[in-house]
């Protein structure tokens, strides 16, 4: 996505720069404890899940990521297939639930409730109704007494489960969240995010989390603004690598063993105004409502115009395919959820679907394309006491990450998940 929006009211402006004096991190739900006050102890390994939004695996080959490459050499790695659509919110929810978007319900970054009972879903939506079809791993862990903390992750601010409060406008009673969580705020720098995680781990064992998430958005932002092959993406990758080094140094200073799992949600493809498909040249405006556009588009026919829409979308453009939702090819594992629009049109990788031709030329990057395309591949590195060193795995699907995390935390195997821990069984100690 172009920039991860605030989970409640904060939205990110494209290409926004960080302030020279960032605001202090909002208070966590438990105060940090200084190292001096901690008794000597043998620390139980923690699991840290890190998302570097929009980081393609081949960014590791640019010579600017020594810390990531060191972890790769000391652990296991692979190119990972995202779920379709290769967008931020659907894939972040897949990573922590083990379900494809069609089953967990976050089928796009922007959605409409087909019943009309709820306002449209946007990047700021925290109404549990949208999220509660699948249980994220921090909820499973908290239910079993494992303390968790999230330093930004889509959906981690949402109250999971519980009973809707009458007249509460989406508020619930008796819900579960991570014990410590942060409302997303782009002005919180990468250094502050890392330091907050280290502060959590500095606590005594009774209040120290055993599962932590950490999220970085700058590589994705640079990819959208300047394209995946740009110097700006290389600079952003170098800075995130520096932050990974800051984290590992902090863990070493605490003598804190950690199984670190580093992922991205999707890759990035170069885009240009010379590769656009204008829907106003395919459909009469009165025939349909156009939803999200870009690498793919959702289309809802106007009542009574279904036949006209079906005919127009039968062979719409040499660089775009369209399907009625019940005829989307099975390999996408998409189309069964009622939140998916009646028609989905998918552009060829690098092409953009727009409502009308742009008035000004543009270039940059985007994602949301066929999840099996090479440009959409995601990053995977895992290193720590649970993993053997220096093993390269075959490509696997990101639905397998949640089962891996369950193994690391000692949680029961999930029932009815779309993924499994099979890719990792031979490379874990």
Residue positions per predicted region:
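Positively charged n-region of N-terminal signal peptides that target proteins for export
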Residues: 1-4
């Amino acid at each position: 996505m172009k920039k991860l929006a605030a989970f409640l009211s904060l939205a990110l402006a494209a290409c926004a720069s960080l302030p020279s004096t960032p605001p202090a991190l909002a208070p966590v739900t438990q105060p940090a404890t200084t190292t001096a006050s901690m008794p000597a102890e043998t620390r139980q390994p923690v699991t840290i899940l890190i998302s570097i939004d929009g980081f393609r695996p081949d960014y590791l080959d640019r010579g600017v990521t020594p810390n990531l490459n060191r972890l790769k050499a000391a652990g296991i790695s692979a190119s990972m297939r995202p779920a379709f659509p290769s967008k931020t919110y659907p894939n972040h929810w897949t990573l922590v639930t083990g379900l494809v978007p069609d089953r967990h319900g976050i089928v796009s970054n922007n959605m409409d409730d087909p019943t009309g009972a709820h306002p449209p879903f946007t990047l700021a939506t925290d109404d549990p109704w949208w999220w509660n079809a699948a249980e994220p791993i921090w909820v499973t862990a908290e239910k079993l007494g494992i303390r968790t903390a999230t330093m930004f992750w889509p959906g981690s601010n949402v109250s999971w489960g519980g009973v809707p409060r009458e007249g509460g406008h989406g508020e619930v009673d008796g819900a579960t969240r991570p014990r410590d969580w942060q409302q997303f705020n782009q002005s919180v720098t990468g250094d502050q995010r890392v330091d907050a995680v280290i502060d959590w781990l500095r606590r005594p064992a009774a209040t120290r989390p055993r599962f932590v998430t950490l999220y970085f958005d700058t590589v994705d932002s640079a990819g959208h603004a300047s394209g995946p092959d740009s110097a700006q993406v290389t600079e952003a990758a170098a800075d995130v690598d520096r932050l990974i080094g800051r984290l590992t140094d902090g863990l070493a200073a605490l003598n804190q063993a950690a199984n670190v799992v580093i992922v991205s949600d999707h890759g990035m493809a170069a885009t240009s105004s010379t590769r656009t498909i204008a829907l106003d040249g395919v459909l009469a405006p009165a025939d349909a409502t156009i939803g999200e556009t870009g690498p793919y588009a959702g289309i809802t026919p106007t009542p009574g115009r279904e036949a006209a829409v079906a005919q127009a979308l039968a062979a719409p453009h040499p660089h775009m395919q369209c399907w009625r939702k019940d005829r989307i090819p099975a390999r996408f594992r998409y189309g069964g959820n009622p939140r998916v629009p009646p028609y989905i049109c998918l552009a060829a990788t690098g092409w953009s679907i727009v409502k009308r031709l742009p008035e000004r030329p543009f270039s940059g990057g985007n994602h949301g394309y066929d999840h099996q395309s090479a440009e959409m591949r995601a990053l995977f590195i895992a290193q720590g006491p649970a993993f053997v060193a220096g093993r390269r795995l075959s490509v696997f699907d990101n639905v397998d990450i949640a089962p891996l995390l369950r193994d690391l935390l000692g949680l029961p195997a999930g029932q009815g998940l779309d993924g499994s821990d099979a890719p990792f069984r031979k490379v874990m100690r």
